[in-house]
Amino acid sequence: MSIELILWLFSFASIMVLIGLTAYQLICLSDLEFDYINPYDSSSRINSVVLIEYALQGALCASFLLTLHWFPFLVMAPVAYYHGKLYMDRKHLVDVTEIFRQLNWEKKYRMIKLAFYFSLFIITIYRLVMTAVTLFIDEDANLVDTRTI
């Protein structure tokens, strides 16, 4: 199996997890808006997955940098920088006392991240299929060459 195929499979799985984590955060905020859960539970659930999301997105960005895939790296680098800046400024966690005031902004922020991750998902699926097809065609061509000898 090619390193590039492994990279795109890792990217596919990582982006699926990122979409799931962002959707989970959005569901927690919607439940809070409709008063299904209290602010403490909502903020503790969101805060428990924020660092996982940041670490996974940073690892994915670093893997694109290390494998010299410049376009995905340049697309993901500003988001990784923003996540790092939020973490360094200690603004990455949702505050229990401020969550109702920031509810609309937090939901918009998560929706934008969800749209961003979906666009990355489309790019990743395309690159995964192209890499798999190219790898399959190259192996098929090598197999035909060895049989003719």
Curated annotation (Swiss-Prot):
Taxonomic lineage of this organism? Answer: Eukaryota, Viridiplantae, Streptophyta, Embryophyta, Tracheophyta
Q: Where in the cell is it found?
A: Endoplasmic reticulum membrane; Golgi apparatus membrane
Q: Which GO terms describe its cellular component?
A: endoplasmic reticulum membrane; Golgi membrane
Superkingdom classification of source: Eukaryota
Protein name (record)? Protein cornichon homolog 2
GO terms in the biological process aspect are:
vesicle-mediated transport
Instruction: Kindly state which keywords UniProt assigns to this record, in alphabetical order.
Output: Endoplasmic reticulum, Golgi apparatus, Membrane, Transmembrane, Transmembrane helix
Its family? Answer: Belongs to the cornichon family.
- Where is the chain membrane-spanning? 3-23, 59-79, 117-137
Q: Name one GO molecular function term.
A: signaling receptor binding
Question: What role does it play?
Answer: Acts as a cargo receptor necessary for the transportation of secretory proteins from the endoplasmic reticulum (ER) in COPII-coated vesicles targeted to the Golgi apparatus.
Q: How does it sit in the membrane?
A: Multi-pass membrane protein
Location, primary (coarse class): endoplasmic reticulum
